[in-house]
Amino acid sequence: EVYIYFPGGFGTLDEFFEIATLVQTKKIRKVPIILYGKDFWEPLLNFIQKTVYKEHAAIDEKDMKLYTVVDSVDEAYDYVIANVTC
């Protein structure tokens, strides 16, 4: 099982945050979460790191490691092969 999110709107963001929250709170087992497209995701992730983590301490540093950002199909494929077992 793996979750791969591509750039999208509120629905995509909702789904990403829902899965990240479920993994963070251990409501579901840890699964690989891939965010595809650095140009799209990095501004949001920078906000999370700067504001949510550093300024407000609302999450732990380990929570920012729940997901991986990739910028190519090859990177996504390599990550899946390395982190998903059947």
Task: Kindly label every feature range from the protein language model.
Residues 58-86:
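A charged, well-structured terminal subsegment
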